[in-house]
């Protein structure tokens, strides 16, 4: 769209007529008024190796420029910055260039500084955009990608750009995904319900905007007419796994809490915007924010898994990762735990939770009911397929610890889990009745399963009591 807007040779002048930009006072001043250089770095990555890719970027672009502007006399026809300036100075009525670099960081992500390619590439960009030629050559430059521009020490390598990222989106926050209004409009157009898309693809909090959707997945879901995980990278679980296997202090604990639906604090400023320089838990979480696997709340400085699509990728990563055996086992056995819960097999439920707790004590330490809730959220992970799992569900006279609400087309009963620490399962059940938690589930036909779970710190055993009542 940027290319079509700026490029002086674009033919379609009606493309923007029904869009907001057409009403801007500066629209006509810039519309299709510039020669545009468009580079897709993924194209170069597929054609060249790390040894000479930077040289080929220059030579390929220069060769094409010579074909378009054959009458220019060049002082140095091997330097792209000089070639561009020569064209601007010598071509009659020549406007400055607009340059668009798509997937600017593909080289950094693909080659990971193989043969020193990172530094060569950054040097090329600095030569283009920070040289004395830059102001005379370019009317504007746009670079899109996953990562912000690489830092050297604490400064950006190209500090004359306005940078907008998942962590610092500035006024561009609306442009990082689809808004809820846009998705509702698309759902109406494609005759598909809004709620499933909200569950699967919503949840990104970008800047102050709450409720941003993954646009690619939304469009594929609308085309296919069903929701699933549609990450463009079919090896998405490998990407997550490569970072969560890093053995930084506190990382495994945070990943478990993220899987359980909790938010985790993160300090994003230390990351150097370099995938080869990941030095801490905070760097890992920051990378996952930039890659779209985590949503970032700048006010609380916390991150969380945004939606069901990403949660599925996290789960796949952990199940396939050997270093996460005990957590993977808990996830794999969670279907049986749910079945035992619905069948009122309280002893089986208590024993299963004993095993999960024992296996995970090196990762998560029990110290209160919230820690117990975190482990139980993992223990009941399979329930997310048929249930909406809500922590601290507002109901009756307080908040139930965990509630499983049946999804549409699920015929199973709702489940209320009340957790106690060093008390009793009877006390947990009594609180469900006293606080009238089940009354808030009157919209769900059939039974409601009431589950009281207590952890005894002295015996390190769990006690479970299960009752059923009509909603």
PLM region descriptions:
Residues 128-135, 286-294, 377-382, 431-451:
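Metal-dependent nuclease catalytic cores in nucleic-acid-processing enzymes
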């Amino acid at each position: 769209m940027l290319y079509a807007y700026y490029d002086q040779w674009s033919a379609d002048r009606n493309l923007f007529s029904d869009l907001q930009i057409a009403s801007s006072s500066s629209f006509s001043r810039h519309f299709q008024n510039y020669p545009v250089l468009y580079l897709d770095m993924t194209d170069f990555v597929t054609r060249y190796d790390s040894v000479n890719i930077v040289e080929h970027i220059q030579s390929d672009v220069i060769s094409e420029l010579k074909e378009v502007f054959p009458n220019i006399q060049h002082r140095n026809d091997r330097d792209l910055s000089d070639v561009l300036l020569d064209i601007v100075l010598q071509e009659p009525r020549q406007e400055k260039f607009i340059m668009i670099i798509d997937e600017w960081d593909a080289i950094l992500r693909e080659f990971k500084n193989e043969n020193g390619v990172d530094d060569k590439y950054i040097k090329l960009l600095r030569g283009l955009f920070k040289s004395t030629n830059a102001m005379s050559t370019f009317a504007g430059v746009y670079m899109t990608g996953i990562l912000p521009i690489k830092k050297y020490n604490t400064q950006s390598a190209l500090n004359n750009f306005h940078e907008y990222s998942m962590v610092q989106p500035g006024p561009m926050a609306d442009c990082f995904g689809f808004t809820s209004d846009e998705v509702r409009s698309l759902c109406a157009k494609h005759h598909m319900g809004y709620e499933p898309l909200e569950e699967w693809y919503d949840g990104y909090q970008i800047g102050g905007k709450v409720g941003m959707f993954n646009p690619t997945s939304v469009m594929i879901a609308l085309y296919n007419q069903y929701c699933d995980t549609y990450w463009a990278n079919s090896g998405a679980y490998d990407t997550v796994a490569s970072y969560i296997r890093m053995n930084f202090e506190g990382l495994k604990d945070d990943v478990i809490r993220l899987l359980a639906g909790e938010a985790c604090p993160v300090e994003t400023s230390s990351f150097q915007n370099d995938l080869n320089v990941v030095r801490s838990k905070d760097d890992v979480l920051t990378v996952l924010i930039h890659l779209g696997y985590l949503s970032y709340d700048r006010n609380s400085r916390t991150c969380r898994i945004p939606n069901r699509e990403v949660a599925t990728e996290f789960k796949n990563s952990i199940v396939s990762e050997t270093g996460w055996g005990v957590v993977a086992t808990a996830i794999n056995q969670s279907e049986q735990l749910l079945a035992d819960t619905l069948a009122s097999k309280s002893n089986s439920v208590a024993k299963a939770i004993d095993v999960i707790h024992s296996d995970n004590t090196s990762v998560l330490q029990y110290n209160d009911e919230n820690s117990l809730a975190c482990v139980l959220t993992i223990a009941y992970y399979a329930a997310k397929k048929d249930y909406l799992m809500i922590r601290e569900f507002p109901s009756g006279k307080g908040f139930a610890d965990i509630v499983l609400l049946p999804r549409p087309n699920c015929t199973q009963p709702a489940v209320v889990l009340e957790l106690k620490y060093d008390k009793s399962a009877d006390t947990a059940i009594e609180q469900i009745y006293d606080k009238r938690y089940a009354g808030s589930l009157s919209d769900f036909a059939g039974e409601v399963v009431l589950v009281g779970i207590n952890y005894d710190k002295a015996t390190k055993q769990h006690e479970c009591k299960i009752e059923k009542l009509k909603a």
